[in-house]
């Protein structure tokens, strides 16, 4: 056991993650023979088989799973040590790990430019995914801060209200409803809706609104991408309800129109959340403070 190295643990974790020696080698920029040799040495150091290879697939043994868990703990401890050292060096270097649901991609990157200029030595990672993917990252404590439109109720987390997040009804400019004013919700339910997938923050907020008004949405198509939804709306397949931020690239005078519908825009919010048990590094805390000092830079008024 004493002869096991950090590099061997890193290689083993990559194999477990990818399920393949070849993919692990590609991920770590190593040759496959090097990966195989590292695993032989680690297995010898541990003293028991760590994996089984059936066909091209790698399966961890019980001992292998224990080693994987230990390697994750080792990596976490080293990351914490790196953050401490960065803290002591006065933010001259360090890591900032952020994650946001897909709609956040329209404004979160805007926040990073000036911060990066102030702290050029900080390495920033921004993960973008759907709500379920981001919640899984949160549950596994993979990042420092998370941007969500609807915080989960089943996790012990800190929740900071950040920005307004108006949800609007959009249609192609050729749609007959574009010329109308004060469109009733009853008329809206007769229109084919193109919506995000069930479980997304936007979908949940809209479903709640329609339920409160005792109406049922006429969802004819589900798409897990805001950009694809906009293309479908532009193509005349229906109307949709999205965050106004999702129109940042086209602008409010672009090919898609915001309809004047009763009860809209739905005034929702963006939240920044993180685990209550998490001790934010100085890097993460500095960025959090920076966000609330510069939130006007990504307000709806500034973007549009």
From Swiss-Prot:
The protein's UniProt keywords, in alphabetical order, are:
Activator, Cytoplasm, DNA-binding, Transcription, Transcription regulation
Offer one Pfam family short name for this entry: HTH_1
Question: Which InterPro entries does the record match to this protein?
Answer: LysR_subst-bd, Tscrpt_reg_HTH_LysR, WH-like_DNA-bd_sf, WH_DNA-bd_sf
Could you list the residue ranges forming a coiled coil in this record?
Answer: none
Domain named HTH lysR-type: which ranges? 1-61
- What are the subcellular locations of this protein? Cytoplasm
Keyword Cytoplasm listed? The answer is yes
Among the GO molecular function terms of this UniProt record, one is: DNA-binding transcription factor activity
The answer to keyword Translocase applying to this record is no
Q: Name one GO biological process term.
A: regulation of DNA-templated transcription
DNA-binding residues: 21-40
Tell me which GO cellular component terms the UniProt record holds. cytoplasm
Note the PROSITE patterns from the entry. HTH_LYSR (PS50931)
Cystine crosslinks: none
What biological function has been recorded for the protein in this entry?
A: Activates transcription of the cmpABCD operon under carbon dioxide-limited conditions. Specifically binds to the cmpR-cmpA intergenic region.
**Of which family is this protein a member?**
Belongs to the LysR transcriptional regulatory family.
In its UniProt entry, what is this protein called? Answer: HTH-type transcriptional activator CmpR
Q: Which organism is it from?
A: Synechocystis sp. (strain ATCC 27184 / PCC 6803 / Kazusa)
Q: Which gene encodes it?
A: cmpR
């Amino acid at each position: 056991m004493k002869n096991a190295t950090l590099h061997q643990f890193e290689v083993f974790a990559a194999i477990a993650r990818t399920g393949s020696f070849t993919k692990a080698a590609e991920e770590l920029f190593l040759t496959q023979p090097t990966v195989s040799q590292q695993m032989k040495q680690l297995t010898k150091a541990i003293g028991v088989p760590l994996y089984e290879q059936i066909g091209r697939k790698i399966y961890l043994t019980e001992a292998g799973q224990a080693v994987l868990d230990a390697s994750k703990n080792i990596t976490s401890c080293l990351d914490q040590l790196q953050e401490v050292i960065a803290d002591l060096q006065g933010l001259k270097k360090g890591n900032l790990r952020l994650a946001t649901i897909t709609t956040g991609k329209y404004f979160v990157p805007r926040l990073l430019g000036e911060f990066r200029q102030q702290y050029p030595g900080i390495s920033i990672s921004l993960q973008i995914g759907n709500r379920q993917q981001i919640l899984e990252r949160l549950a596994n404590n993979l990042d420092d801060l998370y941007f969500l439109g609807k915080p989960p109720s089943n996790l012990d987390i800190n929740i900071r209200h950040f920005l307004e997040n108006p949800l609007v009804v959009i249609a192609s400019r050729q749609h007959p409803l574009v010329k109308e004013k004060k469109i009733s919700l009853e008329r809206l339910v007769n229109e084919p809706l193109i919506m995000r997938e069930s479980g997304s923050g936007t979908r949940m907020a809209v479903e709640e609104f329609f339920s409160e008004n005792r109406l049922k949405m006429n969802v004819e198509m589900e798409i897990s991408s805001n950009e694809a939804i906009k293309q479908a709306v532009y193509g005349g397949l229906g109307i949709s309800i999205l965050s106004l931020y999702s129109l940042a690239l086209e602008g409010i005078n672009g090919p898609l129109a915001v309809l004047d519908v009763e009860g809209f825009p739905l005034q929702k919010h963006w939240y920044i959340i993180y685990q209550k048990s998490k001790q934010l590094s100085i890097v993460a805390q500095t960025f959090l403070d920076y966000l609330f000092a510069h939130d006007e830079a990504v307000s709806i008024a500034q973007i549009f």
